[in-house]
Each structure stands twice: as structure tokens, then as C-alpha cells.
Design a protein with these regions (language model features):
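Alpha-helical recognition segments enriched in aromatics with Gly/Pro capping
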Residues: 1-139
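Structural preference for alpha-helix termini/caps and helix-kink/transition segments
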Residues: 77-215
Length: 215
């Protein structure tokens, strides 16, 4: 273990101080948003606040704190001992990025999210359906403010997704402007951000059975 000399003997900074030091170096004495899991609320984040304010002589540390709830796997808490850890590299190899984004946005960040096959399948079917109203749009096409309102309300992603469903229904029966609004609202959160052809290629590639699985 690395250590340094001190008046009290050899020692090293604890993890609370490590985070305060990194925040000060890269973000400054005060910054806007600090995130982390709900399990870090106490004692880690409270210690960060106390020592950073004292060291920097400031009244605040971070202006806003966003604590996310846990992701479970089939209603079980993720744990290495259980062998049910969700690795990002595995997701990238098996799940299209759009499906992954929609799945993660399906619950508010403060609420637990259960990761299971049904969630992924439902999100894949939703994306597939939404591509029925896909339209190439200009990059500077703006999303109407009223559509964005849920995101202003403590990042209410389920509320925003509900708006996307309403926009899809309108786009399906409407004109090109309705479709453009729908697509721009989807692309604002990283959905429908590839061409319809690319999405179809992804579907086909996932539908093919590898030869080694046949033999």
C-alpha cells in the first residue's frame, strides 16, 4: 500500500479525501452537479462536503446532488458472488446502443431498475416500431419546449418516454413535420440516431444463427 510520512506516522488519504482532491483539481472549488449511487449518500458524500468546504473556504461544494438507485438482475441485487454482474463490454457486444439507452431511461434514476430479458425485448420492439415513422431530418431541428418539460423535472425520463409515445402516434397519422418533431425528440436522447437501413442490418445480424450453433 502506498503511504507518506506524517506527524502521526505513515499513512495515506482515505477515499473521501481522494474524491475531494480529484473534484478540486478537475472541477474547481465549486461545481454544478455531483452524482453517485444512493449508497454513497452517507458517509462518503457528507464527508466530501464537510472536508471540501473547510479546505476551500466555500459555502457549498456541489450545487446539485443526483443519487441513483440500484440496478437489479431478475429482482436480485448485483453481486460478484452471485455471478450476476452486468458488464458494459458485454452489453456493447450483445445489445444495440439504442435499446440499452431506452432500457436505462425506462425508470427514473432515483428508482430501482430490474434488468431482465423482457425489458430488453420490450425496448427492442419499441425501437423497431418507432422506425416506422423515421425520417431524415436536419441536425439543427429543435425539439419543442413542451416536449422537454419532463427532463426539466429532476430528469424525469419515464415522463419523456411517455411524450415520445404520444409523438409517435401523432407522427404515424400526421405529416412530415410531425415525423420530424418525433425523430428530433428521439435523437435528443440518443434514439433513432442511425438510419433505418442500419437498424435493419442490426436486426438481420441478430436474427442469423451462427454456424457453430447449428453444428
Amino acid at each position: 500500500e502506498p503511504s507518506w510520512d506524517s506527524p502521526w506516522g505513515k499513512g495515506r488519504p482515505g477515499w473521501h479525501l481522494e474524491c475531494s482532491a480529484m473534484s478540486k483539481k478537475f472541477l474547481g472549488d465549486e461545481f454544478d452537479v455531483h452524482g453517485g449511487g444512493i449508497d454513497l449518500l452517507f458517509p462518503h458524500h457528507e464527508n466530501e462536503i464537510a472536508q471540501s468546504r473547510c479546505a476551500n473556504g466555500t459555502k457549498i461544494f456541489a450545487k446539485f446532488w443526483m443519487h441513483n438507485a440500484f440496478i437489479t438482475m431478475s429482482n436480485e441485487k448485483m453481486a460478484k458472488s452471485q455471478g450476476n454482474i452486468l458488464k458494459i463490454k458485454d452489453c456493447r457486444n450483445k445489445i444495440n446502443g439504442q435499446i440499452l439507452r431506452l432500457a436505462l431511461m425506462s425508470a427514473n434514476y432515483k428508482q430501482p431498475l430490474d434488468w431482465n430479458d423482457k425489458l430488453i425485448e420490450d425496448c427492442k420492439n419499441t425501437i423497431n416500431k418507432w422506425y416506422n415513422s423515421y425520417l431524415d431530418i436536419e441536425k439543427n431541428f429543435k425539439v419543442p419546449e413542451e416536449i422537454l418539460q419532463p427532463l426539466y423535472d429532476d430528469l424525469n425520463t419515464p415522463g419523456y418516454i411517455a411524450n415520445l409515445h404520444k409523438l409517435y402516434d401523432k407522427a404515424l397519422k400526421g405529416n412530415d413535420r410531425d415525423r420530424s418533431i418525433f425523430v428530433s425528440a428521439c435523437q435528443f436522447v440518443g434514439l433513432l440516431n442511425e438510419s433505418k437501413e442500419s437498424w435493419l442490418e442490426f436486426k438481420i445480424s441478430k436474427a442469423l444463427i451462427p454456424e457453430k450453433e447449428i453444428l
